[in-house]
Amino acid sequence: MKALQKVILTAVLLLTVNSYYSQSKEYTELYNSITPKLQETAAIKQKFYGKEFSEFYKYLNNKGLKVIKLSYLSVPSNMKKINVLELNFLNDEQQYYAYKNKFAEPYIYIFLLDEIPQEIRAMVFNTHGFWNEDFAQFLSKLRIEKMEFHGLEGISNRYYTKPR
């Protein structure tokens, strides 16, 4: 009976370790597929300054970069005016895995020249922040002031020194 317990315990431990390495490999592959495209985009970000969001979004799609989630911010934070978008390229599970393992998470802050209409609050709330084409249409005419790219300095460099 004790031998059976040891075999079961060993099997459970091996499956757990295998699952961890599988997830780690999966996240590494995802990170390595996203970041080179974002690094390339960061290098030419000024090209989109003053342009409408729709132009930048079309570029992301053409690069195969799929926005998964978004959130919004006010800068400075004491303003009621919403003028910053955060675009994320990971789903909740991937973000949690990255956070738990202290891995970098690639995302973009987009500072807008135009105020984002207050309706964005309800849209984000109703979709739990998951991106859909309604957001693309809603934000399409807003002009980009500047962008910051985060999480591109390597998978294990969670606390980056400065954005691109």
Model-based region annotation:
Residues M1-Y27:
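Bacterial Sec-dependent N-terminal signal peptides
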